[in-house]
Amino acid sequence: VKQTLEDTRAILNIAGIENPKEIVFIVAPEWKWDAIHTAGQLADGRGQVKLNQLISSVMPNIPPESKKMGADFLKKWVLRDIPSLGPGWQSKYSLQIDEEEILSDSIEFFSNIFGCEISVVNADRARSRHVAKGNQSSPLRPAIFVS
């Protein structure tokens, strides 16, 4: 919740939005969590993961409609996210949390802070205007849609 609060404040600040009408937190779909868990199992002692090994392990389990996005996500995760997280990143992702439930339980908190309607949706169930933004979600980093 703390990281999502900080991320939302940063987005509002960068976009120059003082009075948002609505904020939607779009949490990562199950297959992204599964991919991260697999990456953790494949990581070497330094926390590095071979992209080709991860792709061959994970792609068969990604829903057909998400294959292209899945390949892009895995590539970004291995080449950018893992190096920025540093050694030992796997421990942060070892337990899957129900982000949708946690953020849903915090709707009133966020609504009081930002003074607008707050909703939480899983990227798998995102409505048309949220789909592109939902594709940016990762485990522990929901996509944030502001209007």
Predicted stretch roles:
Residues V1-S147:
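Basic, alpha-helical terminal appendages of large translation-related enzymes
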